[in-house]
Amino acid sequence: MPLLVEGRRVRLPQSAGDLVRAHPPLEERARLLRGQSVQQVGPQGLLYVQQRELAVTSPKDGSVCILGSDDATTCHIVVLRHTGNGATCLTHCDGTDTKAEVSLIMSSIKSFSDHTQRGRLEVHLVGGFSDDRQLSQKLTHQLLSEFDRQEDDIHLVTLCVTELNDREENENHFPIIYGIAVNVKTAEIYRASFPDRGPEEELRAARVLTGGPMISIYDAKTEQLRIGPYSWMPFPHVDFWLQQDDKQILENLSTSPLAEPPHFVEHIRSTLMFLKKYPSPTNTLFPGNKALLYKKNEDGLWKEISSGGET
């Protein structure tokens, strides 16, 4: 069955703006979310999700209570939740392969869901803006269409994307919301930023920059964050890119150069330096080709434990 709003089938294709105008509760929810102040989320109990990563857990999790992601410009952050058992998935989609990504989101939630349970699947889409290349608009359409193609009823509860998440300044467009968090125990979704994006922020970013697909990074049964093992080819012309000025990096390595957060170029440079240092990560970063495993300690912070077994 399809994507529903207020129990009614969503008529697609239509723009995000037209969709919320047809459903006042959606419009009001987007307005309230945009109007929030940004909360800075500390590392305790947090699982930070990078671009092209997915994490799913439930209120039974004793380690992770907040899932979050930010730095979404043309990207969208997707939260899918089962209201019966509270299983919650957060992912940061960039349009690389939306069909496969939505399929992964659905299967990750279903791995938790006993469908004899009461409750329903609710989806929240946040991110993007009115960018010149219409990448946000395309991603919004892809996500709505793919959720509409699923067998299950999926209730669209939050839609704050593209033109609904846009502000204009000096004739340039920017997102209003760059990041959100979801409290797994209360289901609250709120605007957020994250000073701590670990563990292994550079390693995870390097995987994305070299074209890695969407992956699930967390095992809620063992409450372990699993990183890798990854492999990539040496990044082409890495020395050339490291010699370029900020403007060149922005214009060539961003989908939306004018709308990126201030730390974007620094983040890209550090990721390129990492790729230069580790052109082939398999044995240098993943001894024995085993995953890096992390678990929350008593203070709610990630701590590395012994490497994983199977690859």
Curated annotation (Swiss-Prot):
Gene encoding it? NTAN1
Location within or outside the cell: Cytoplasm
Its cellular-component GO annotations read: cytoplasm; nucleus
Q: Which InterPro entries match?
A: NTAN1
| Quaternary data | Monomer.
Q: Which GO terms describe its molecular function?
A: protein-N-terminal asparagine amidohydrolase activity
- Annotated TM spans: none
Pfam family for this entry, one:
N_Asn_amidohyd
Q: Which PANTHER family match?
A: N-TERMINAL ASPARAGINE AMIDOHYDROLASE, PROTEIN N-TERMINAL ASPARAGINE AMIDOHYDROLASE
Q: Name one GO biological process term.
A: adult locomotory behavior
Catalytic activity line of the entry: N-terminal L-asparaginyl-[protein] + H2O + H(+) = N-terminal L-aspartyl-[protein] + NH4(+)
User: What keywords are annotated for this sequence in UniProt?
Assistant: Cytoplasm, Hydrolase
- Highest taxon listed in the record's lineage: Eukaryota
Keyword check for Hydrolase: yes
Q: What is this protein called?
A: Protein N-terminal asparagine amidohydrolase
EC number(s)? 3.5.1.121
- EC primary class: hydrolase
Per the entry, what this protein does is:
N-terminal asparagine deamidase that mediates deamidation of N-terminal asparagine residues to aspartate. Required for the ubiquitin-dependent turnover of intracellular proteins that initiate with Met-Asn. These proteins are acetylated on the retained initiator methionine and can subsequently be modified by the removal of N-acetyl methionine by acylaminoacid hydrolase (AAH). Conversion of the resulting N-terminal asparagine to aspartate by NTAN1/PNAD renders the protein susceptible to arginylation, polyubiquitination and degradation as specified by the N-end rule.
